[in-house]
């Protein structure tokens, strides 16, 4: 299928872009010590530019020391300019065009992102300081031009400083920048646009990121007001608008990095409502992962260009594969947000990652070819085993995958049974097809034993046998009636009824609760010794409250079940007086979702040790954990063979 609209050229002021695909600015955490660019950030952008992207927008840069968060690079001195030149040079060498997102975080200062989690109340800006900030935006624009960027983007969304001025509930000023009128609320942003424009060549385009809809705040900027502002901004020198959604002060955060809970294109109706009323190119943002949808939106006139963000994290060749009719070969984003968001807010993570692309942010290392092709036995055809085989084959090795069951897929097939998670099943089935396309044999219905390892005599073994559900050791559980395992519920082998209690508030427990609600079970309670939603990731946990508000799914945190009787549990918790108390609760059905344990692997590793065969145990076979850990370990194991 051809995508003529998506891959047609477009001109922004004096800049001609080869197609309508934009890599939006996304936090990668690849900045070194707040001030330096290493090998990784240029290579990351070069991979997407070489992959066919029309415009790469480099993640946001801070305009001044006061707003310089440790996650981001600054752009307020010549050293920053010279460091960013490494990125623009890499993008240009790969055949792309480069823009940069220029930013002031406003109420989100350094302390918000400090690893100590220390927060301080920000000061009210004086008018003099506002004028200084406007000038600092202009100076950053000047430095960006000198760094070789082809376009600039002014970040005005997501409750950062420009949005704070625009929003009537966040703007509490009473002066000429205050919320007494739309003109006042827009004054700062228009001054910034004019100042940036003064420091840019006449033929260089200036973009601005805005929210297509302002929401979940005490008061909001209306669509009419946004449209009026865009007209004023265009007169001030703006050339295109990049319409996003979400803010950092409410549950609307979920729209900034949309997980699988949101349908692809979820923001497009909001964007289209603005586009039909403005006379300026519009970039659409909203979980676009399919080239057919992107092309359709442009053909229908809802957008002029499309931001393809997480989809290009998952596959940097997204554009080339789409243009060349190889859509089936695209490694698709599944919307888990485990690597692209949870790693951003994890102070231990050095950069973002991706469940579908464990080589993300490691592009600078390349894919080293094997000096000697080795025969590798991969045990387990789940997400980790299949991905290990793919990387091994790509490096020139000869992997063979062995799977004990009759079909590949592992727990990702089961994960896809939960509401809105079909992409997980699709992903692991894609990996199985990719293995076949690459000529990798998958032997199903074969249980690998020490004897088989001795018979095959591989050069290397990777054990990816995964984990299995285990019932907890609770008195009375084994003899109680109407007790189910979450795995059987999601697989459709069992259906609880009536008042249902789910033991375990991790991802499996919460998704089982969602599954039951979708299948007509109306009284569902999730209980956990910690918090409900642990290990689900921040955004997906937030969606529990959005999609299942109030008591739709009841939640009991800090509750430890100590006994199971006849349709009754006994549980202990700490009350407000800090005393441990016990209570009982009736159930009609009890579902066990307390987690998984790694399958035994010692017989396999011992056999390898005796035979002198190098062996790696990866993913849940090593430690029952998330899919993102399995694919990261698969990549690492494949790279060392």
What are these regions (language model features)?
Residues 1-379, 383, 391-394, 399, ...:
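Flavin-dependent oxidoreductase catalytic cores
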């Amino acid at each position: 299928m051809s995508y003529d609209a998506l891959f047609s050229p477009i001109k922004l002021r004096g800049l001609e872009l080869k197609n309508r695909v934009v890599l939006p600015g996304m936090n990668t955490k690849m900045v070194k010590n707040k001030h330096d660019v290493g090998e990784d950030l240029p290579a990351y952008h070069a991979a997407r530019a070489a992959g066919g992207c029309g415009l790469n927008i480099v993640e946001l840069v801070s305009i001044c020391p006061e707003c310089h968060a440790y996650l981001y690079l600054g752009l307020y001195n010549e050293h920053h300019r010279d460091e960013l030149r490494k990125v623009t040079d890499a993008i240009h060498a790969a055949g792309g065009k480069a823009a940069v997102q220029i930013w002031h975080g406003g109420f989100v200062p350094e302390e918000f992102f400090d690893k100590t989690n220390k927060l301080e109340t920000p000061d009210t800006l004086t008018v003099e300081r506002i004028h200084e900030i406007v000038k600092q935006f202009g100076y950053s624009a000047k430095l960006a031009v000198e760094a070789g960027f082809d376009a600039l983007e002014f970040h005005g969304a997501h409750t950062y400083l420009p949005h704070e001025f625009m929003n009537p509930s966040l703007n509490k000023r009473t002066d000429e920048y205050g919320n007494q009128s739309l003109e006042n609320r827009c004054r700062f942003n228009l001054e910034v646009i004019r100042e940036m424009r003064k420091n840019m060549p006449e033929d260089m385009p200036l973009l601005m990121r805005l929210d297509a809809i302002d929401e979940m705040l005490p008061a909001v900027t209306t669509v009419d007001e946004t449209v009026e502002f865009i007209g004023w901004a265009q007169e001030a020198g703006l050339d295109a608008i990049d319409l996003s959604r979400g803010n950092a002060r409410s549950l609307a955060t979920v729209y900034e990095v949309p997980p699988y809970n949101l349908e692809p294109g979820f923001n497009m109706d909001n964007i289209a409502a603005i586009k039909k009323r403005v006379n300026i190119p519009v970039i659409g943002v909203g979980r676009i992962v399919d080239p057919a949808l992107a092309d359709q939106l442009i053909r229908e006139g809802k957008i002029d260009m499309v931001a393809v963000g997480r989809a290009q994290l998952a596959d940097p060749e997204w554009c080339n594969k789409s243009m060349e009719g190889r859509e089936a070969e695209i490694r698709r984003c599944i919307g888990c947000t485990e690597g692209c968001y949870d790693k951003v807010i994890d102070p231990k993570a050095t950069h973002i990652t991706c469940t579908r692309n464990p080589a993300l942010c490691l592009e600078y290392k390349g894919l080293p070819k094997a000096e000697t092709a080795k025969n590798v036995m991969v045990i387990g055809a789940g997400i980790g085993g299949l991905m290990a085989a793919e990387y091994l084959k790509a490096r020139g090795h000869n992997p063979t995958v062995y799977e004990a069951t009759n079909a590949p897929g592992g727990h990702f097939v089961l994960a896809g049974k939960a509401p809105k998670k079909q992409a997980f099943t699709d992903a692991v089935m894609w990996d199985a097809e990719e293995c076949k396309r690459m000529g990798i044999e998958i032997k199903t219905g074969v249980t690998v034993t020490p004897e088989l390892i001795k018979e095959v005599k591989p050069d290397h073994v990777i054990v990816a046998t995964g984990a299995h559900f285990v019932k907890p050791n609770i008195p009375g559980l084994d003899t109680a009636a109407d007790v189910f395992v979450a795995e059987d519920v999601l697989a459709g082998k069992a259906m609880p009824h009536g008042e249902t209690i789910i033991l375990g508030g991790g991802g499996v427990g919460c998704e089982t609760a969602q599954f039951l609600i979708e299948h007509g079970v109306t009284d569902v309670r999730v209980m956990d010794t910690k918090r409900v939603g642990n290990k689900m990731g921040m955004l997906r946990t937030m969606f529990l409250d959005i999609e299942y508000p109030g008591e739709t799914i009841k939640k009991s945190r800090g509750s430890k079940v100590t006994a199971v009787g006849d349709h009754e549990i006994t549980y202990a918790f700490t009350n407000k007086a800090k005393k441990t108390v016990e209570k009982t609760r009736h159930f009609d059905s009890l579902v066990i979702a307390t987690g998984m344990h790694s399958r035994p692997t010692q017989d396999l590793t011992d056999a390898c040790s005796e035979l002198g065969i190098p062996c790696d145990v990866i993913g849940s076979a090593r430690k029952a954990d998330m899919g993102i850990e399995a694919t990261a370990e698969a990549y690492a194991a494949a790279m060392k063979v």
